[in-house]
Amino acid sequence: MGRSNSRSHSSRSKSRSQSSSRSRSRSHSRKKRYSSRSRSRTYSRSRSRDRMYSRDYRRDYRNNRGMRRPYGYRGRGRGYYQGGGGRYHRGGYRPVWNRRHSRSPRRGRSRSRSPKRRSVSSQRSRSRSRRSYRSSRSPRSSSSRSSSPYSKSPVSKRRGSQEKQTKKAEGEPQEESPLKSKSQEEPKDTFEHDPSESIDEFNKSSATSGDIWPGLSAYDNSPRSPHSPSPIATPPSQSSSCSDAPMLSTVHSAKNTPSQHSHSIQHSPERSGSGSVGNGSSRYSPSQNSPIHHIPSRRSPAKTIAPQNAPRDESRGRSSFYPDGGDQETAKTGKFLKRFTDEESRVFLLDRGNTRDKEASKEKGSEKGRAEGEWEDQEALDYFSDKESGKQKFNDSEGDDTEETEDYRQFRKSVLADQGKSFATASHRNTEEEGLKYKSKVSLKGNRESDGFREEKNYKLKETGYVVERPSTTKDKHKEEDKNSERITVKKETQSPEQVKSEKLKDLFDYSPPLHKNLDAREKSTFREESPLRIKMIASDSHRPEVKLKMAPVPLDDSNRPASLTKDRLLASTLVHSVKKEQEFRSIFDHIKLPQASKSTSESFIQHIVSLVHHVKEQYFKSAAMTLNERFTSYQKATEEHSTRQKSPEIHRRIDISPSTLRKHTRLAGEERVFKEENQKGDKKLRCDSADLRHDIDRRRKERSKERGDSKGSRESSGSRKQEKTPKDYKEYKSYKDDSKHKREQDHSRSSSSSASPSSPSSREEKESKKEREEEFKTHHEMKEYSGFAGVSRPRGTFFRIRGRGRARGVFAGTNTGPNNSNTTFQKRPKEEEWDPEYTPKSKKYFLHDDRDDGVDYWAKRGRGRGTFQRGRGRFNFKKSGSSPKWTHDKYQGDGIVEDEEETMENNEEKKDRRKEEKE
């Protein structure tokens, strides 16, 4: 990255003339667009995505406006967007990673970095096609945008230099062979060199590639593809009659086209220096690949490099067809490979570029190109036929087989042209796809080995195996082969597609040996990529003539053939594996018959099974001569009769019985229902009550207190009173709950103001009687009042389990105006109850005193002492301590003065009584 910052603008300029200006204008508009809140995901998305910033920085991560825009972008005095929609940077500081707007140096790379989106034709074609030769092909920007040497990617930088070197190295060879020079210049000006030619090539290639990859033409049009100065798609038919040459070339081009895209996408070095030079021919002008042109074009010294890249290249290109898997894989691997290959090739060029004997390199190049072509063409057939032309020369079956393959190829072309969907394509594509996937993986593995090995260019791809020959021998052979191939292609062209078709179909059906051949070849080719070295060893043993693995042909009419191989399947497989053997003419009708025969065999098989079933049934499962229909109807009838028979008596009986029984039943049912409902109601009541544990406890307390007599000593009077009250129905409690709230508050205020000094016992008694009268209404209210006041009578202790309703807990706290408040909050429990272990363990947990009485007095006293606190502000209940009851505070406050228990109780009771009176 840093590399280019220094040259920020220059990088954009020279090589990129078009693209830069275009992108600049684009970015202006983009700026406008950015003011929309969405941050224009379209552009920014992919671009920023390739540089993987952590999400926060990716400007488009999820709109991440909130994350960084306000801070990073915000200019001086603007609110979110005021004055600044898209011009984030204008006023504010520009974070580096964002410097991606028109002026930023970054753009150099960011533009090219977005292969995923624009990979094929959209932007790139826009920028390239206009001034394509000027800008895009210039050495510097060989892969239009990416490679500007300044652009950040190290690969591209290297590439730039590499290209220069390559060019130097090639200076001489270029003069030598015009064709070659063309191929080398092509990277620079693919489109400069006469358009007619490129168009021509394009037609050929696109046509053929159209056949091969029916979808390919879309790719071909992209200016990136070597062959389309103008996207002209030729109808496949033209190509169908084309010679082997275009065929070969298309195999390359079909493969290379994608590879070109992928290169541009991945900045493959090949696009630029080495590829352009080395494989230049195969890449850019398919016509030169064709065997006819093979001889000169392949031979640049750079060739030495190209092959290293080529396989990778091809695999990359191919895989780029399958964008899902391939692109990603290749994008990753491609970068590294490219880097690696660039370095190596650079070195290689320097060392060998000039020194290598041009002649040798040429021949090797052609030979290599040949081999490459052969094993690149992983499509079973194209790959095959090319090989065949070479192979069979060695095997002396030259003429027939190559012709065959050629015919087949033409046949296939025509078929494909007619029905883009034909099986051949599908299966062919599959094989290719597999091949490609495999290749792209393999090429990684093989790449080092193959680089080393291939430098010697001495592979000859033979039918027999990869026979490794010394270049000297191979050169001659290759020349001859080239001639042969030319001858053959000419011959082939003459054949009419119809003948071819018929022959082909003939061949289709004898598929065994070719199948084998194809598989063999395919295996070999992948094998070769995988480990060229091993191939060397293998070469010796796998001479095809000796080791003949024959696949026993499965006769089509064999009745045992599994149904799975039905007509379509066979047809497809045979089409794919065109058979090279049978040359004699067989009318197409034979073939038609054959698949039918196979179909009929499956039918006959079914028929056979059916008859067997019938036979068995007749023999072993004889049924009474009843038809199924009869049998089932009889079942139905029987069931109907049965039901009717049963039904009528039942009905009558029911009628007879019903008046009494039904009445009985209904009565019982009604009672049950009533009972249930009552239970449910009761349950509901219980449930409601008990839903709140506190209610439950209160209820229990009530019940218990009922049993205990009211006649308890004055000491217990308040307790007993409470007991009387508690039994009251809970409903009343509920109804008075609210009242009690208000009353409670009033009580507190009043009682707090009323003096705490004890009044005479008599007055207290009066009050008690009044209270008892009130009990009905106040039951719970009282309970509540006293609850807090547990301190007065012994029971006081328990209330430390904060037992009251939730409100109560707090009331008590610091505000406790003596027992008064606390009364309001906690229900006081009668003495006996208090010690109920169920409720209150008399534990030191709650009291610091072991002695209960002390505790009581202490509490009462404390309460009283505290009472003064609130008296002044009588009106308000201070629930000061929120949730903790009095005892928590007291617990920590020392024991205070222990008063006489009686006295405290009396005082408290007095207070209670007084309060009640006031209430009344």
UniProtKB/Swiss-Prot annotation:
Post-translational modification (record): Citrullinated by PADI4.
Modified residues (Citrulline): 803
GO-annotated molecular function: DNA binding; RNA binding; transcription coregulator activity
Cross-link type Glycyl lysine isopeptide (Lys-Gly) (interchain with G-Cter in SUMO2), residue numbers: 188, 332, 413, 421, 437, 457, 462, 491-492, 501, 536, 548, 550, 567, 580, 593, 599, 622, 676, 778, 784, 831, 911
Tissue distribution of the protein: Ubiquitous.
Covalent cross-link Glycyl lysine isopeptide (Lys-Gly) (interchain with G-Cter in SUMO1), where: 580, 831
Bias type Basic and acidic residues, positions: 47-63, 160-196, 353-373, 384-396, 472-502, 638-656, 668-750, 763-785, 908-920
Omega-N-methylarginine modifications at: 809
One cellular-component annotation, GO: nucleoplasm
One Pfam family matching this protein: THRAP3_BCLAF1
Subcellular location: Cytoplasm; Nucleus; Nucleus speckle; Nucleus, Nucleoplasm
Biased composition (Basic residues): 23-46, 87-134
Amino acid composition bias (Low complexity), ranges on this chain: 135-154, 751-762, 810-825
N6-acetyllysine sites (modified residues): 152, 332, 421, 437, 475
Residues where Phosphothreonine is found: 341, 355, 402, 431, 494, 566, 661
Span list, region Disordered: 1-437, 464-502, 637-796, 810-840, 862-920
Keywords linked to the UniProt accession: Acetylation, Citrullination, Cytoplasm, DNA-binding, Isopeptide bond, Methylation, Nucleus, Phosphoprotein, Repressor, Transcription, Transcription regulation, Ubl conjugation
InterPro entries, per the entry: THRAP3_BCLAF1
UniProt family annotation: Belongs to the BCLAF1/THRAP3 family.
Protein name: Bcl-2-associated transcription factor 1
Organism: Homo sapiens (Human)
Lineage: Eukaryota, Metazoa, Chordata, Craniata, Vertebrata
Gene: BCLAF1
